[in-house]
Amino acid sequence: MNPLIFTTILMTVLLGTMIVMMSSHWLMIWIGFEMNLLAIIPILMKKYNPRTMEASTKYFLTQATASMLLMMAIIINLMHSGQWTITKVFNPTASIIMTSALAMKLGLTPFHFWVPEVTQGISLTSGLILLTWQKLAPMSILYQISPSINLNILLTMAVLSILVGGWGGLNQTQLRKIMAYSSIAHMGWMTAVLVYNPTLTMLNMLIYIMMTLTMFMLFIHSSSTTTLSLSHTWNKMPLTTTLILITLLSMGGLPPLSGFMPKWMIIQELTKNSSIILPTLMAIMALLNLYFYMRLTYSTSLTMFPSTNNMKMKWQFETKRITLLPPLIVMSSLLLPLTPMLSILD
């Protein structure tokens, strides 16, 4: 793709998301979503082959359906309230349809069906954009309409997303699918606390983006797309493999790593505002995610696959250094001591 065209398309993706996040008018929000959708398709299809074509088509159809539902909810809300502002969703039917549309855009259960298939069919770089930047716009709208959302529907979606995100990733060998199911589970954690403490949801989103960005950059750096190819990186780049292990454990939510902080604060917030059953269920279901993270770390760093090379370390050219990677790894693993400073979120 021509660099100028690619830059223009990328800037349109960024502009579409920024329009959604900064607008208070429903029509402008819908236009921002459409700009973002039409511009992201060529990025997903950058490496043109039948797999990327299929993945892009699935993504387009899903997001177009979600946009249609969103416009329907906007019109119903307009008929009942007579205003285009995003301050409140006045009609319960409009609220349910709007929540479903945004859940489809985010990949929440039961609208999660497209996330693993689309992520698997595209490149690692496109997958990174899909699982991080593309979550910002719908989550910002959910954040703004959180007082109007039906709590029971949102909590049901959240719990099912954590369950499906853990269960779906158990027998996967493809790293992109594992990251997709991980994304579904993390979205579940975010939406579970959205009504009670929206600011905590945004904190969780920030830490999730940092951890996912770190993981994808490490996968790109080691050229790994499957658990088998990842297990061979120990011979080539042991430091990168160690960093992958630490980041995976952080994504699983193990203390004293950064990923433990949002889970801890979300469970604390839910315990304050609702019964003890919901946070207990969420913590138990999070063990499914932790299991496949631990299995991945075991196959990556604690097993040595047979190799025809007798040398422990393989000879290789000097790999390209990524300047952004060290600070991202630090933030993805060492933010837990900052937790007392975040007491303001209460």
Curated annotation (Swiss-Prot):
Q: Which InterPro entries match?
A: Complex_I_Subunit_2, NADH_DH_su2_C, NADH_UbQ_OxRdtase_chain2, ND/Mrp_TM
Question: Where exactly are the transmembrane stretches of this chain?
Answer: 3-23, 25-45, 59-79, 96-116, 122-142, 149-169, 178-198, 200-220, 242-262, 274-294, 322-342
Q: Name one GO molecular function term.
A: NADH dehydrogenase (ubiquinone) activity
Q: Does the keyword Translocase apply?
A: yes
Record key words, sorted: Electron transport, Membrane, Mitochondrion, Mitochondrion inner membrane, NAD, Respiratory chain, Translocase, Transmembrane, Transmembrane helix, Transport, Ubiquinone
Q: Which GO terms describe its biological process?
A: mitochondrial electron transport, NADH to ubiquinone; mitochondrial respiratory chain complex I assembly; reactive oxygen species metabolic process
Q: Name one Pfam family in it.
A: Proton_antipo_M
Whether NAD counts among this entry's keywords is yes
Entries under PANTHER family matching the protein: NADH-UBIQUINONE OXIDOREDUCTASE CHAIN 2
Q: Which function does this protein serve?
A: Core subunit of the mitochondrial membrane respiratory chain NADH dehydrogenase (Complex I) which catalyzes electron transfer from NADH through the respiratory chain, using ubiquinone as an electron acceptor. Essential for the catalytic activity and assembly of complex I.
Q: Which family does it belong to?
A: Belongs to the complex I subunit 2 family.
Q: How does it assemble?
A: Core subunit of respiratory chain NADH dehydrogenase (Complex I) which is composed of 45 different subunits. Interacts with TMEM242.
Q: What is this protein called?
A: NADH-ubiquinone oxidoreductase chain 2
